[in-house]
């Protein structure tokens, strides 16, 4: 009996120790291979992401083709509105007509270098960086965006600790114009000229950027279980864009007069882009974990997903274009020309406006002080003096009143002539 109790106690102890040892081994293996395991090489990760994006794009195109074959398209009927007889009715402008009148052959035209466009983009980015260095507007906007309403409850306030906008500029090259249909699918040579009649033109260009654009933040993880603020874990992250290369597609989407939609500029990147990131992390306050590979993988995957969901085909961004007709309110420059020019006329008109405002202000002051209604004539300002309450009912010019107010009122003699004061 005693031997049976000892054997059962030993078996229970052995089982407990074996279970604890198994848990320790599993936790160690998880930390070693899942958290601190070596991440895949950047080339392998980029190839896997490109394959996934390509399969998603092909699936979207197949679904569009299936939808087209199942639902026949009908030509949209426009409303029969009476047009003005003054405006000439031009021939319908198709894609082939635009290509013919601009002498552009999409099948044989060589790609363009876009050197002039690179200079304009570089000047724009340089001015943007200079404005960012001048004030803290971009820092304030980033802090407000990071601490917006979407911030989870287990995160403390996010502070931006480093911001670098880089020093280099993107290089655009190999620009070509291709015809696409209304869904953005390329119309090849097999489509013929008839297939390009109702499509639109799309410009595609290669873009390459090799720079070091960095954003570093720090925050705290708030562990609120089993009670609020049971533990606080400081976390610091730094994300740097090292290189971006891809193909940018730009096209004009014409507006529809039926529903009142404006003309927009649509742009997106093709699914063959590559984005190389460098992510540094620091977790803890005393015993710190630096550059945890799993954290870098999670953040990099999240950033790629964010970019894919916004401006990688089949998704695209649209910018509403303003009216390109010249307008007076949009005119700038030319104020330093001679007086005989139009700008000189604008300056004289402004001076007349200022003078008129001064006269109006003086008239209101006279009315407030004397209770006399002041009227305006075509030649200047006159006073309409009522007969009641005044001696003689004579009129007094505004310039005399302004001159008398400009001098010392304590030296004015009662009953003296207008404009006459005692020195």
UniProtKB/Swiss-Prot annotation:
The family note in this entry says: Belongs to the MMM1 family.
In alphabetical order, the GO MF annotations are: lipid binding; lipid transfer activity
Q: Which HAMAP family match?
A: Mmm1
Localization terms from the record = Endoplasmic reticulum membrane
Q: What biological process terms from GO does the record include?
A: aminophospholipid transport; mitochondrial genome maintenance; mitochondrial outer membrane translocase complex assembly; mitochondrion-endoplasmic reticulum membrane tethering; protein insertion into mitochondrial outer membrane
Protein's job = Component of the ERMES/MDM complex, which serves as a molecular tether to connect the endoplasmic reticulum (ER) and mitochondria. Components of this complex are involved in the control of mitochondrial shape and protein biogenesis, and function in nonvesicular lipid trafficking between the ER and mitochondria. The mdm12-mmm1 subcomplex functions in the major beta-barrel assembly pathway that is responsible for biogenesis of all outer membrane beta-barrel proteins, and acts in a late step after the SAM complex.
Spans of biased composition, class Basic and acidic residues? Answer: 350-367
Q: Where are the transmembrane segments?
A: 16-36
Q: What is this protein called?
A: Maintenance of mitochondrial morphology protein 1
Bilayer topology term: Single-pass type I membrane protein
The entry's keywords: Endoplasmic reticulum, Lipid transport, Lipid-binding, Membrane, Transmembrane, Transmembrane helix, Transport
Q: Which residues lie on this side of the membrane: Cytoplasmic?
A: 37-423
Domain spans labelled SMP-LTD = 110-322
Q: Which domain of life is it from?
A: Eukaryota
């Amino acid at each position: 009996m005693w031997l049976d109790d000892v054997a059962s106690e030993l078996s229970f102890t052995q089982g407990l120790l074996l279970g604890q040892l198994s848990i320790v081994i599993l936790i160690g293996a998880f930390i070693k291979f899942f958290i601190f395991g070596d991440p895949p090489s950047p080339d392998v990760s980029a190839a896997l992401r490109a394959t996934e994006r390509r399969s998603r794009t092909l699936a979207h195109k197949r679904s569009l083709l299936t939808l087209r074959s199942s639902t026949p398209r009908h030509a949209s009927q426009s409303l029969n509105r009476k047009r003005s007889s003054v405006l000439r009715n031009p021939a319908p402008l198709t894609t082939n007509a635009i290509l013919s009148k601009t002498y552009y052959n999409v099948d044989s035209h060589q790609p363009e270098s876009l050197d002039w466009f690179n200079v304009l983009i570089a000047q724009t980015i340089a001015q943007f960086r200079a404005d960012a260095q001048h004030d803290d507007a971009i820092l304030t906007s980033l802090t407000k965006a990071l601490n917006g309403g979407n911030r989870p409850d287990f995160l403390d306030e996010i502070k931006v600790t480093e911001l670098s906008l880089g020093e280099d500029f993107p290089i655009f090259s190999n620009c070509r114009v291709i015809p696409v249909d209304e869904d953005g699918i390329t119309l090849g040579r097999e489509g013929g000229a008839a297939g390009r009649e109702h499509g639109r033109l799309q410009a595609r260009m290669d873009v390459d950027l090799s720079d070091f654009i960095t954003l570093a933040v720090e925050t705290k993880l708030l562990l609120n279980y089993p009670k609020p603020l049971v533990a606080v874990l400081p976390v610091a992250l730094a994300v740097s864009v090292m290189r971006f290369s891809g193909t940018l597609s730009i096209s004009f989407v014409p507006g529809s007069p039926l529903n009142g939609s404006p003309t927009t500029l649509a742009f997106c990147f093709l699914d063959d882009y590559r984005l190389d990131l460098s992510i540094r992390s620091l977790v803890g306050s005393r015993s710190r974990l630096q550059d945890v590979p799993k954290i870098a993988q999670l953040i990099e995957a999240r950033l790629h997903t964010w970019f894919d969901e916004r401006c990688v085909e089949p998704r695209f961004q649209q910018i509403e274009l303003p009216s390109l007709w010249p307008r007076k309110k949009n005119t700038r420059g030319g104020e330093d020309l001679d007086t005989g020019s139009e700008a000189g006329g604008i300056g004289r008109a402004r001076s007349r406006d200022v003078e008129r405002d001064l006269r109006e202000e003086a008239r209101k002051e006279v009315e407030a002080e004397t209770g006399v209604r002041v009227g305006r004539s075509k030649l200047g300002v006159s006073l309409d003096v009522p007969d009641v309450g005044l001696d003689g009912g004579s009129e007094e010019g505004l310039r005399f009143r302004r001159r008398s107010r400009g001098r010392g009122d304590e030296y004015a003699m009662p009953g003296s002539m207008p404009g006459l004061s005692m020195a």
